UniProtKB/Swiss-Prot annotation:
<protein>
    <recommendedName>
        <fullName>Protein YceI</fullName>
    </recommendedName>
</protein>
<dbReference type="GO" id="GO:0042597">
    <property type="term" value="C:periplasmic space"/>
</dbReference>
<dbReference type="Pfam" id="PF04264">
    <property type="entry name" value="YceI"/>
</dbReference>
<keyword id="KW-0732">Signal</keyword>
<feature type="signal peptide">
    <location>
        <begin position="1"/>
        <end position="22"/>
    </location>
</feature>
<keyword id="KW-0574">Periplasm</keyword>
<dbReference type="InterPro" id="IPR007372">
    <property type="entry name" value="Lipid/polyisoprenoid-bd_YceI"/>
</dbReference>
<dbReference type="InterPro" id="IPR036761">
    <property type="entry name" value="TTHA0802/YceI-like_sf"/>
</dbReference>
<dbReference type="InterPro" id="IPR023480">
    <property type="entry name" value="UPF0312/YceI"/>
</dbReference>
<comment type="similarity">
    <text>Belongs to the UPF0312 family. Type 1 subfamily.</text>
</comment>
């Protein structure tokens, strides 16, 4: 009896230890469970919201060792959508994103640190031909098995960037110098 109990305990510990190791995930863009959104103030009176409809990425998540976490995302900047065709054309122009010259933006994490129940994800954001460090505050929404026999993990992250830091010089007024980033992703664990 003692041997059976010892074996069961050992097996449980092995399973628990195995579930705490880093896992690689692909962002689920096919299932439309991921969003790269932004907002900026309009004249200081309201918020203008937008999204990038085409992006892809991966992340590594280790709940016990955040320093092992990694994030890599590529965004097709021509996919910007603010629900206004003429404004979207202007955002794609050299006044803003210059998508003809820089059709992609990328984010590659350089460090991840646990801060209470959040993760501070610092990385290099390349946008409009400029690379600058940006920190996103991320929170694990949930993780576990999905109905199709796989595993998933979901996060929401927020951050801010200054337009001038990324060579966007169009003056939108004093209330519109920063853009809020609001990112929600669900990843499918890779085998």
């Amino acid at each position: 009896m003692k041997k059976s109990l010892l074996g069961l305990t050992f097996a449980s510990l092995m399973f628990s230890a195995g579930s705490a190791v880093a896992a690689d995930y692909k962002i689920d863009k096919e299932g439309q469970h991921a969003f790269v959104n932004f907002r900026i103030q309009h004249l200081g009176y309201s918020w203008l919201y937008g999204t990038f409809k085409d992006f892809d990425g991966t992340f590594t998540f280790d709940e016990k060792n955040p320093a092992a976490d990694k994030v890599n995302v590529t965004i097709n900047t021509t996919s910007v959508d603010t629900n206004h065709t003429e404004r979207d054309k202007h955002l794609r122009s050299a006044d803003f994103l210059n998508t003809a010259k820089y059709p992609q933006a990328t984010f590659t994490s350089t460090s991840v640190k646990k801060d209470g129940d959040e993760l501070d994800i610092t990385g290099d954001l390349t946008l409009n031909g400029v690379t600058k460090p940006v920190t996103l505050e991320a929170k694990l929404i949930g993780q576990g098995d999905d109905p199709w026999g796989g595993k998933r993990a979901g996060f929401e992250a927020e951050g801010k960037i200054k337009l001038k830091d990324f060579n966007i010089k169009t003056d939108l007024g004093p209330a519109s110098q920063e853009v809020d980033l609001i990112i929600s992703v669900e990843g499918v664990q890779q085998k």
